[in-house]
Amino acid sequence: METALATLSVQGLLQRREQYVEFRDSPRWVFDFPRFKNLSSPLPISPSPQSMSMLSRLVRFLKSHPILFLLLLTPGIPEYLSASSQITLLVVFPPLFFLFLAANVGLYGSGVILIREAMIRWKKGWASVFLLGVAYGIVEEGLDLWTLFYSKAGPVGNLGFYGHWLGVNWVWTVGLLIFHSVYSIGLPIFLFGLVFPELKTKSLVSGTRLAATALCLIADSIFLFVFVSAIYSGYNPGGTLLLFSGLVASTFVVLARKLPDNFLRTNPGQPKWSPRKFAFAGALLFPATLLAGGIAAGANLPPEIPFVLDIILAAFILTRAYKSMGTVNNQEEKVALSIGLVFPIAVFGLIASIGLANPLIIVPDLFFILFSRRLWRKWHQWTLLHRSALQTTLPGFGESPAPLFP
């Protein structure tokens, strides 16, 4: 394993010079002394332009545009990695692909930015984020796309009839709201904090940009409402059901606003689980919740069972993982939990798309593998340094950790 380290010597402190340390399999250190201007900032290792790969160029571009990274990450997981939106449309019918991409970015991107801003400005914790994620899910799937109500909606399948009561697909609804709360909202915010640790508690938009983000979400919702109304021309959920859904979504927003920031607290100290156990717990969430309804429907179980079981399992897995995360030296565990959460979605999306026989179906999975590998290596290196009692700054995504010796 090779990694680059930057250290300061007495001469470097006087002359503002930077030292690079290279670890190899043998305990051999190699030093170099290029010029350095700012002693307080992390020291990035910049490869020559000739040796930079396309991925490295993309990483550098996204590092300088954090909002763009969040906008691409947010629909990337719930839509393109899960194959809910097909990337193969880029070849089959490009105009439709970019139309759906714009709609997804406008909907998911605006939603996650607004919820992240609420989390920071209201000084709330992850419990409030999950409640806001449920409210977002009601807006998208209920008010915009009607999948919470319409029994014959494309993605609903047999869950449009199993557990359908008073005009609502209850089993489908609870699983989908958990999915949006965790994967569409919570996970992108969580990953953003790992990729950009220096921006973890900072607002990304304010003033005019904040208002524009809210208007984008409203405009996108209106567009989808009109679009779905034209597709489902023989169905209308009715004003009463839509109004009730809006009131429920508003209630979740109010609850998130009033919930104490320490409502969901992690146990202090070191992580209680290993990274492998966190990855396993994360990988359990998707099949234990969203897939449970389909299994219960196939077994002809009473719909109340998966409805209640989904809520219990999601709450149990998430709270146990969060409380076991610890408060120090937990970066590897956070990355492992994130990878575990995404892995079953990637597998599900690949299986769902395999019949298309188009090589583009593996593109989202390749990006997931490369992204996960880079993120894991980054924080694994940082953890090794931290455990070696080196004073370090939090590394940025695509940068090597920079130890500062006392």
Task: Describe these PLM feature segments.
Residues 79-97, 151-170, 228-241:
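Membrane-interface interhelical loops and short amphipathic "cap" helices
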Residues 54-101, 145, 298-316, 323-335:
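Transmembrane alpha-helical insertion/packing segments
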Residues 63-79, 213-221, 279-288, 339-345:
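Alpha-helical transmembrane segments
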